[in-house]
Amino acid sequence: MKPARQAVDGVLLLNKPVGITSNAALQKAKWLLNAKKAGHTGTLDPFADGLLPLCFGEATKFSAYLLDADKRYRAILQLGVTTRTGDPEGEVLATREVRATCADIRAALPAFVGEIEQIPPMHSALKHQGRPLYEYARAGVEIARAPRRVHIRALDLFKCAPPRAVVDVQCSAGTYVRTLAEDLGNALGCGAHLTALTRTASGGFLLEQAHTLAELEATNAGARQALLLPADCLVAHLPSVHLGETAAASLRQGRSVPDAADRRGLVRVYDGHGVFVGLAEAEAGKLVPRRLIATVQA
């Protein structure tokens, strides 16, 4: 009999394989770690692989900071073929001759760098009236979608052998790389879809740091938690504040504490022993608790 689930806290950088959903990968890791509470920080489609940070226990309180972080991807485009879903899982809608050269592809990329508008794909988890768009799409219902602004920080041609091209994308959260591929194909006059997609970075985390499910499974059950990063790694971009024990205890109890420094905004708070207390808002000469680590866990 599997032992009772534990209060596991931390972040697992997972290298999700192709062929499973992000939730299936999460549930497998949760089972292997015997964890009570878990969540991920941004879905990868089943056909995609790469970095999928998973949050456990107290770390789930800070997952939004990574969910909203920039992402990096390596995408393989098939020019001249469009599919219903914009990826290899959808039926082929049209095939066209590809006349674009590598020089043409490279010349088309700058138009997609910066702030651009995207119409979210129907085959996405974006919700309309409480239901994900992909449910409407499967039922053959088309929903009008408003364009959304996203930011493409960088878009580079990594490899080129038409009708295939490999591009590296650095983008804001909420960017649909499938839509970017389709729009690039349209700009080249031939259409396109993604045949593969790998997330190579999320926030400050890199794919090279990630563990596979096979690696997690092969690790002794008692040593698996050693693969987790501490919860405060999710907010490492914020400035830190170290408090004495009395002030830290007050903050843990949900009370604001005086702050002598002239600063504003969110800060990471640590006690005198370097233990992460949580996040506080620096305002008007005090630190106001915003998101705290539970000191007693069931």
From Swiss-Prot:
One of its GO terms (biological process) is tRNA pseudouridine synthesis. Coiled coil: none annotated. One of its GO terms (molecular function) is RNA binding. It holds the Pfam family TruB-C_2. It is an enzyme of class 5 (isomerase). It catalyses: uridine(55) in tRNA = pseudouridine(55) in tRNA. Keywords: Isomerase, tRNA processing. Responsible for synthesis of pseudouridine from uracil-55 in the psi GC loop of transfer RNAs. This is tRNA pseudouridine synthase B. The gene is truB.
